[in-house]
Amino acid sequence: MNLIKLLTNEWQEMTEKLLKCELIDLNEYKDLCRRTHNIVHNFSDKDTVPKEICNLILELQWFSWWIADAEWTPMHGLYQELGNVITALQCHFFSLDEKYDDIEPFLDCL
């Protein structure tokens, strides 16, 4: 569970960067998405989900909300793509659509 808490903290840091209008390193972001996807994938078919995973998904939601609020920025197109990756992670977790099982096509759009 320590890995999940670490990922949650990293997403909090990403959110703080957004709030400060700092640039986001795409390679760092893609790596974080891949690591998150691997963790989420391990729990997507489970009947019970650890609280830490719920907190991680909640942090992803906060990040995506701040991206949505960033529409006025010159990087809006990028933020929209970042939001699509977050949506893919969340949909995969909740098993809403099999097309979200592979996150790479979404990362390739960045």
Language-model regions: role of each:
Residues 6, 31, 35-38, 59, ...:
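Charged, amphipathic alpha-helical oligomerization/scaffolding segments
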Residues 1-33:
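Short terminal alpha-helical segments
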Residues 37, 41, 62-65:
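Amphipathic alpha-helical core segments of compact helical bundles
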Residues 39-52:
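Short, solvent-exposed, charged loop/turn and helix-capping segments
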Residues 30, 50-56, 80:
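Short, charged, amphipathic alpha-helical segments
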Residues 14-22, 43, 67-71:
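Secondary-structure edge/capping motif, primarily at the C-terminal ends of alpha-helices
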Residues 23-25, 45-48, 72-76:
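Charged, low-complexity interaction regions
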Residues 60-110:
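Amphipathic alpha-helical binding modules
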